[in-house]
Amino acid sequence: MAAVARGAASAGGEVIGVVPGSDPGEANPDCTHVVATGIGHARNLAVVASGEVVVAIGGEWGTLSEIGHARSIGRTVVALRSWTLGGRDRMEGAPGVIQAETAEEAVAAALAEL
């Protein structure tokens, strides 16, 4: 997330950080606006519900939970070298999941879903 925030900020974009704790200071310094939720991992649902398309980049357990939340509320997920759920071939063709190999592919796929 830090690299995404840095890239967006360096391009002049506004960066909204949604942090799990109640301290806005835990946000990345590149965040323009911070939402300190104080709700721990439950903030993952707030993050995915706030957008129209979810782009999952790489990821650990939190990313996997965000993918699950996104699909459970009907959000399309663009997976950029992200979770494969048992192998890339099993994720390919999964309803509501679009695979991307590059950032450009991910952005194009996300914009096409809007």
Please give the residue ranges for each predicted region.
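Acidic/glycine-enriched connector segments
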Residues: 1-75, 83-89
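Short acidic-hydrophobic, aromatic-tinged amphipathic segments that line or gate anion-handling sites
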Residues: 34-38, 95-109
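Short, hydrophobic alpha-helical segments
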Residues: 110-114
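Mg2+-dependent phosphoryl-transfer enzymes with acidic/Ser/Thr/Gly-rich catalytic loops
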Residues: 50, 89-100
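Conserved catalytic/cofactor-binding microenvironments
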Residues: 80
